[in-house]
Amino acid sequence: MSQTQRMRLSTGVELDVWTAGDRANPPIIFLHGFPDSHRTWRHQMAGLSDRYFCIAPDQRGYARSDKPQGIAAYKVPVLVADVLALTVSEAAQLF
């Protein structure tokens, strides 16, 4: 079963995040490309959620996640910081 949650990250953005599987299992984070959303990974998540805890965010600028203004808000180091912040946030919930 999958569920959606809105997560405020330490980077200042809120992302919609879909999860599936048991939090006790090893995690996998699925990251979509341009111009997709978490739905890119729905079939993989369904197939892997019995063995892994699957995490698929709608990254900044996509779907219902926050859409900060300005090109600087979408540079690679900023996007990487979002993923790291998501990882830290999920890890805090896992342990």
Per-range role (PLM):
Residues 1-14:
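N-terminal cap/lid segment of alpha/beta-hydrolase-fold proteins
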Residues 2-4, 40-43, 47, 78-85:
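Alpha-helical elements of Rossmann-like donor-binding domains used by nucleotide-donor carbohydrate transfer enzymes
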Residues 10, 18, 56-95:
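Active-site loop/oxyanion-hole signature of alpha/beta-hydrolase fold enzymes
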